[in-house]
């Protein structure tokens, strides 16, 4: 390993509870965390420490599983086990709950904004993916409900530049969606993992998709042209990283600034992989660049790269804390 992860901060964010997710705002100056205590906490740096700026505790009745900032940074979406998604609007130093999106039958596992900020995707244990549209008056409308998975849907992620959506599920599959005639459809199903697919991340250009799974592998998928003129997407697995993780890989994040790939694992470890720039793009080679075996003393649930500062990585854990690391590639 030629790189290193250096711990910069460790913060008890959700005491006596799991910290499920940590998300940087688009400016890279603020963090949002969520947990089993039903709360969302907003964090800012003061001097050399991270301080809680506000607590959003009145939006959900159960665990908050995921938080996502809008591309403009003025809104925060939260997905909860109470089957709702809350949209929060930033007002000065506080946030107000603007609207509650209802419709899922069970726990909402993930929420994600499209790069345009005008579309939102949610997914749930009810096996469905919902696409929502937001207008200039902050009104949210469900455009489409897609039932392409046969089990709990764990994760949704948008392509960085296109209105293309990917989802990961307990059914071991990944689905790729595009809009067709005002309706959203599954255009490709990616099969290859042997167990639950927990998370997905696109590379900075959106040409490749990385997935992580309960089968302890990371797979890299690349869009390939079908050549038959059909409108369906075709994606193939061009690389599998195996033998690096001791337990389930819960999250994966591709750094937009450096191209480094980070993973969060049930063995309490955080790992960063770097790509060999000399390798064939159709057969990429990723090497383990940095590994902190006990990054947290319980499962690591999330890895999140700062969008503005290269190499700054946030992680969070079942022990209720989040940590900030500095990744140095060499």
UniProtKB/Swiss-Prot annotation:
- Biological process per Gene Ontology, one example term: iron-sulfur cluster assembly
Q: Where are the WD repeats?
A: 14-53, 59-98, 103-142, 148-187, 192-231, 244-283, 295-330
| Gene3D superfamilies listed in its UniProt record | YVTN repeat-like/Quinoprotein amine dehydrogenase (2.130.10.10)
- Which of UniProt's keywords are assigned here? Repeat, WD repeat
Q: Which CDD domains match?
A: WD40
Name of a matching Pfam family: WD40
Q: Does the keyword Repeat apply?
A: yes
Q: Which GO terms describe its cellular component?
A: cytosolic [4Fe-4S] assembly targeting complex
Family per UniProt?
Belongs to the WD repeat CIA1 family.
Give a short account of what the protein does: Key component of the cytosolic iron-sulfur protein assembly (CIA) complex, a multiprotein complex that mediates the incorporation of iron-sulfur cluster into extramitochondrial Fe/S proteins.
Q: How does it assemble?
A: Component of the CIA complex.
Name of this protein = Probable cytosolic iron-sulfur protein assembly protein ciao1
The UniProt gene name for this protein comes to ciao1
């Amino acid at each position: 390993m030629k790189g290193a992860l250096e711990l910069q901060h460790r913060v008890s964010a959700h005491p006596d509870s799991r910290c499920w997710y940590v998300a940087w705002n688009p400016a890279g100056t603020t963090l949002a965390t969520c947990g089993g205590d039903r709360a969302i906490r907003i964090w800012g740096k003061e001097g050399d420490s991270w301080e809680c700026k506000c607590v959003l505790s009145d939006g959900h009745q159960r665990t908050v599983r995921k938080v996502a900032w809008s591309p403009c940074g003025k809104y925060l979406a939260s997905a909860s086990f109470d089957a709702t998604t809350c949209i929060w609007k930033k007002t000065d130093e506080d946030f107000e709950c603007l609207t509650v999106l209802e419709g899922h039958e069970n726990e909402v596992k993930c929420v994600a904004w499209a790069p345009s900020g005008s579309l939102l995707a949610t997914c749930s244990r009810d096996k469905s993916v919902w696409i929502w549209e937001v207008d200039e008056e902050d009104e949210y409308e469900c455009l489409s409900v897609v039932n392409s998975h046969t089990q709990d849907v764990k994760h949704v992620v948008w392509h960085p530049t296109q209105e293309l959506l990917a989802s990961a599920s307990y059914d071991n599959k990944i689905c790729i969606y595009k809009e067709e005639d005002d309706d959203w459809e599954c255009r490709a199903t990616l099969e290859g993992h042997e167990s639950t697919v927990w998370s997905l991340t696109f590379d900075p250009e959106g040409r490749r998709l990385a997935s992580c799974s309960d089968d302890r592998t990371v797979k890299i998928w690349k869009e390939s042209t079908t050549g038959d003129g059909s409108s369906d997407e075709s994606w193939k697995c061009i690389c599998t990283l195996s033998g690096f993780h001791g337990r389930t890989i819960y999250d994966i994040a591709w750094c937009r600034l450096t191209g480094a790939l980070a993973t969060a694992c049930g063995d309490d470890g955080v790992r960063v992989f770097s790509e060999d720039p000399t390798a064939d793009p159709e057969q990429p080679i990723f090497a383990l660049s940095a590994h902190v075996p006990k990054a947290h003393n319980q499962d690591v649930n999330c890895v999140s790269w700062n969008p503005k500062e290269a190499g700054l990585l946030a992680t969070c854990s079942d022990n209720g804390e989040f940590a900030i690391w500095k990744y140095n590639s060499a």
